[in-house]
């Protein structure tokens, strides 16, 4: 008896106490409904996305930990613009436009997997991804928006989200 790990993919906030999840949880002697409820709480902010969940169970104490791997930045950006795939020619063929605040929201969602220390740095990372798949921001090339972020033009917007960034 030791540590067991169960890896499973679920739709954010929509895990069900059914196969393949339920039998694996039952076999470890855990309350299936409670674990599924906890998984749904942990994945709620990724509603509409398929996310990888790692359930780490101590077989001796029956205590468990849930780790959620967020969707990729590309998946989040594509869903935000309603596109199914990136542009094959992002410099000339745009697939959509997003408001700057949506970029900030995606940066906050991605905080656990980004190496950015500040919200501003995280936003610049997401802007780079948006540019590489053919998305404009507020009708502008994300490279221009990145320059404007560096110049402080978006400081007021970023300040509104700072508390949310700290909690993420």
From Swiss-Prot:
Disulfide bonds: none annotated. It comes from the Archaea. Pfam families: Ribosomal_L11, Ribosomal_L11_N. Keywords: Ribonucleoprotein, Ribosomal protein, RNA-binding, rRNA-binding. PROSITE patterns: RIBOSOMAL_L11. Part of the ribosomal stalk of the 50S ribosomal subunit. Interacts with L10 and the large rRNA to form the base of the stalk. L10 forms an elongated spine to which L12 dimers bind in a sequential fashion forming a multimeric L10(L12)X complex. Forms part of the ribosomal stalk which helps the ribosome interact with GTP-bound translation factors. Belongs to the universal ribosomal protein uL11 family. This is Large ribosomal subunit protein uL11. It comes from Hyperthermus butylicus (strain DSM 5456 / JCM 9403 / PLM1-5).
């Amino acid at each position: 008896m030791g540590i067991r790990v169960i890896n499973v993919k679920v739709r954010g906030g929509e895990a069900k106490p059914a196969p393949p999840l339920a039998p694996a949880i039952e076999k470890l002697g855990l309350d299936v409904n409670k674990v599924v409820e906890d998984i749904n709480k942990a994945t709620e902010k990724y509603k509409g996305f398929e996310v990888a969940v790692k359930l780490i169970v101590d077989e001796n104490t029956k205590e468990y930990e849930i780790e959620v791997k967020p969707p990729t930045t590309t998946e989040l950006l594509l869903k935000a613009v309603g596109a199914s795939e990136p542009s094959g020619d992002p410099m000339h063929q745009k697939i959509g436009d997003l408001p700057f605040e949506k970029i900030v929201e995606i940066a906050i969602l991605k905080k656990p997997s980004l190496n950015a220390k500040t919200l501003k740095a995280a936003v610049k990372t997401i802007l780079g991804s948006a540019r590489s798949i053919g998305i404009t921001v507020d009708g502008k090339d994300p490279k221009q928006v990145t320059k404007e972020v560096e110049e402080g033009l978006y400081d007021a917007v970023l300040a509104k989200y700072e508390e949310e960034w700290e909690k993420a």
